[in-house]
Amino acid sequence: MIELKEVVKEYRTKNKEVLAVDHVNLSIRAGSIYGVIGFSGAGKSTLIRMFNHLEAPTSGEVIIDGDHIGQLSKNGLRAKRQKVSMIFQHFNLLWSRTVLKNIMFPLEIAGVPRRRAKQKALELVELVGLKGREKAYPSELSGGQKQRVGIARALANDPTVLLCDEATSALDPQTTDEILDLLLKIREQQNLTIILITHEMHVIRRICDEVAVMESGKVIEHGPVTQVFENPQHAVTKRFVKEDLNDDFETSLTELEPLEKDAYIVRLVFAGSTTTEPIVSSLSTAYDIKINILEANIKNTKNGTVGFLVLHIPYISSIDFGKFEKELIERQVKMEVLRHG
C-alpha cells in the first residue's frame, strides 16, 4: 500500500511562492497500476518525484509499505530507492555504455558481483525483448528500444514500485502501445505496483486500474478508470475524455438545423454488458419512435468496455421521454440531453 497524506510542495523565489502540489491525498493498492493525468503545469511531475524523495515535500507524508519516506536515514532512503525505481520520458541512458552495461549500471552501484550483475542484466534484456542487442549503443536504438533499456535498468534491483514519468510521450502510437503491453506483462510477472503520469487519456485507459486527475497542483477527481471515463465530473476530466474519443460533435451541433418541437439530441453512455445489448432498437419499438444514430464510439479500458452513442429523436412526448429516461437508468445507461426542440 502507498499513501500520500496532505502532501504539499511549495517553491519559494524572491518574488513569489509557487504551490506545485496542493494538499494531495492518495491511496494506491499494492500490485495495481495507478495513473496520474494532467495538462502541463498541473503538478504531476513534481508529485511523482516525491514518491522516491527526489523532491522532498514541504509538508505531508509519503508512506510506502509502512515506511515514512521523509523519516528514513540516508542509508535507509538509499535502500528504499532501490525498491522504488523510475523510468523517464527521455530515457536517461549512458551513451558511452552498451545496452547490457546500461542495465548493469545500478547493480554495479549496489555492489553486486560482476558475474551476477551480468547474468541478471542478460535476463532483463530477454524480458524486455532486446535479445541480440546487448552490445548496441543507445545511438543505434529506436526510441522504443531505448525505453526498453530504461525499463530493464529500472528493474535491475528487483523493485516493488515502478514510477513512470511520461514514459511514452516521446514515442509514436504503435511503440507507445508496445511499451504499455510490456509494462502490463512485467506487472503480472513481478507483481509490481506501477505509478505513471501522462497527459494522454489513451495511456490511462489502456493499462491503469485507477486514475487521479490533477489541475493546479490539486487532485480534482479520482477513481477506477472505467468509472471516471464513463462519468467524468470535472471540466478537465471531460476534456481528456473528449479528446480520447476524438469527439467534436458538440461543435457540429451549432451547425444543425433548429430542432422541431419535442425533438431531442441525446448522448448515451454504456458500460460493461450493456454495450452489447440492443437497447436502442428495443426502446424504439417500445415507444414507437424513430431514433437516428448520429455518432457511435466504443472504447476499451483495462477493466471493461465503455460505449457512447449520440441519438436524434425527431419526436417524443414529454411524458414518454420521462419514461424513456427512467428505463435507461434502470438499464444502467447514462443519458445527457445535448439539445431539445
Curated annotation (Swiss-Prot):
Q: What GO CC annotations are associated with the protein?
A: plasma membrane
Cited Pfam families: ABC_tran, NIL
Catalysed conversion reaction = L-methionine(out) + ATP + H2O = L-methionine(in) + ADP + phosphate + H(+); D-methionine(out) + ATP + H2O = D-methionine(in) + ADP + phosphate + H(+)
Transmembrane stretches, start-end: none
Q: Name one GO molecular function term.
A: ATP hydrolysis activity
Q: Which organism is it from?
A: Staphylococcus aureus (strain MRSA252)
Protein name per UniProt: Methionine import ATP-binding protein MetN 2
SMART domains for this protein: AAA, NIL
